[in-house]
């Protein structure tokens, strides 16, 4: 099934409901501290404005729990202010996302003007994909557009449920870009295709690893999950984090990679500390084995060099998961080293959301990558080969 996109629709004079992802971080004063998600939605919003649509935007923010101060702490007002600055035009903020007041605002909305509905999750029915709530949202729209890739793996009322009750539906440009880049990286990559996989737990990445082993030419493993693989090979790992109940699974993954003739690379040296703290002494262990009393907290310099060489020789590079405890400076070189190597590569470089995207952002290298996914859980599920409800709803 092909993805129908917003540019295939006539939007003039229509009520165009765009599900965006404005789940942005706020400081204690309620100011947006990182507007990347708002900026990511701009091409779709601008297209609808220029097409003279009545633009209705909807998003969630945080996880409201029905507390009295949720309405002030988790309001979308800061997002409305920032969006207004980015668009250089007024953005009307509704005080709810359903109800008579909202219907009146939609009725009075002029072509080319923008209305942002209040936080969808102030209504528990949103996450329950409640049919009556989905119908109520749908009553505001002639056209439904999903541009929130970050929530595309959730079957919520606004991300999937309401699509059944709106005649015209499409993906926004952000969802289209995500599906194209992630789909191409995994479906028909230019080869050699090198995958870099990190993170703390093998259990979080089982399906991702299995899918990548079926498609990649080489998989470079870092992060704490590497110690489970090393222990599965009989290598001492000191006090490193190990999932004891996943050792057999790690062996099976190693065997599968060997059977498929995929190079599965594990660290050959480590940056260690006595504990995972910024103040711990940084010890470079020039060996696969980690001594007792130390724990691996980052890949070592030799390992980083090996991974750099693989990246340099690749035509497609996909990265998901940090190489170490990169939030703390002593253990950040592996992660930022991978980011820099990818930035310097002419290959198609795709970063699969979550912590890797945060690291690329922190390193100021977003513009040097072909694509940095905005979806953490959504990009993981896409890589696992699962169907995303928010994407399926946009198919013709």
Curated annotation (Swiss-Prot):
Major subcellular location class: cytoplasm
Annotated positions binding substrate: 21-23, 37, 60-63, 121, 154
Isomerase listed as a keyword: no
Designated name of the protein: Phosphoglycerate kinase
Enzyme Commission number: 2.7.2.3
SUPFAM superfamilies in the cross-refs: Phosphoglycerate kinase
Subunit note: Monomer.
Entry's Gene Ontology molecular function annotations: ADP binding; ATP binding; phosphoglycerate kinase activity
Pfam family, any one: PGK
Catalysis performed (reactions): (2R)-3-phosphoglycerate + ATP = (2R)-3-phospho-glyceroyl phosphate + ADP
Keywords: ATP-binding, Cytoplasm, Glycolysis, Kinase, Nucleotide-binding, Transferase
Organism: Anaeromyxobacter dehalogenans (strain 2CP-C)
GO BP field: gluconeogenesis; glycolytic process
Family indicated by similarity: Belongs to the phosphoglycerate kinase family.
A GO cellular component annotation in the UniProt record: cytosol
Nucleotide-binding as UniProt keyword: yes
Enzyme class name: transferase
Pathway stated in the Swiss-Prot or TrEMBL entry: Carbohydrate degradation; glycolysis; pyruvate from D-glyceraldehyde 3-phosphate: step 2/5
Subcellular location: Cytoplasm
Binding-site residues for ATP, renumbered to this chain: 205, 296, 327, 353-356
């Amino acid at each position: 099934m092909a993805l129908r996109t917003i540019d295939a629709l006539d939007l003039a004079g229509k009520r165009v409901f765009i599900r965006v992802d404005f789940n942005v971080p706020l400081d204690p004063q309620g100011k947006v501290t990182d507007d990347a998600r708002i900026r990511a939605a701009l091409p779709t919003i601008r297209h609808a404005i220029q097409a003279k649509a009545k633009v209705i935007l909807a998003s969630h923010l945080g996880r409201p729990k029905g507390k009295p101060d949720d309405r002030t702490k988790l309001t979308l007002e800061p997002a409305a202010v920032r969006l207004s600055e980015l668009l250089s035009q007024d953005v009307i903020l509704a005080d709810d996302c359903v109800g008579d007041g909202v219907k009146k605002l939609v009725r009075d909305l002029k072509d080319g003007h923008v209305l942002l509905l209040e936080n969808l999750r102030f209504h528990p029915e949103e996450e329950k994909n409640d049919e009556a709530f989905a119908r109520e949202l749908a009553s505001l729209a002639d056209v439904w557009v999903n541009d929130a890739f970050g929530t595309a793996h959730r079957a919520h009322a606004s991300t999937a449920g309401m699509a059944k009750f709106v005649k015209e539906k499409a993906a926004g440009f952000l969802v289209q870009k995500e599906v194209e880049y992630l789909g191409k990286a995994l479906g028909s990559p230019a080869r050699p295709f090198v995958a870099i996989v990190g993170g703390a737990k093998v259990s979080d990445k089982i399906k991702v690893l299995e899918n990548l082993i079926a498609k990649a030419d080489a998989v470079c493993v870092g992060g704490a999950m590497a110690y489970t693989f090393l222990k599965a090979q009989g290598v001492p790992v000191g006090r490193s984090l190990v999932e004891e109940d996943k050792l057999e699974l790690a062996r099976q993954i190693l065997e599968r990679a060997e059977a498929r003739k995929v190079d599965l690379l594990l660290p050959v040296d480590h940056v260690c500390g006595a504990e995972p703290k910024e103040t711990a002494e940084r010890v470079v262990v020039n060996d696969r084995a980690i001594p007792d009393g130390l724990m691996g907290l980052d890949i070592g310099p030799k390992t980083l060099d090996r991974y750099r060489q693989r990246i340099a020789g690749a035509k497609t590079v996909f990265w998901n998961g940090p190489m170490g405890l990169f939030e703390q400076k002593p253990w950040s070189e592996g992660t930022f080293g991978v980011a820099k190597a990818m930035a310097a590569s002419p290959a198609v470089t795709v970063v699969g959301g979550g912590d890797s995207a945060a690291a690329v952002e922190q390193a100021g290298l977003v513009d040097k990558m072909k694509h940095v996914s905005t979806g953490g859980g959504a990009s993981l599920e896409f890589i696992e080969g699962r169907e995303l409800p928010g994407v399926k709803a946009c198919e013709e």
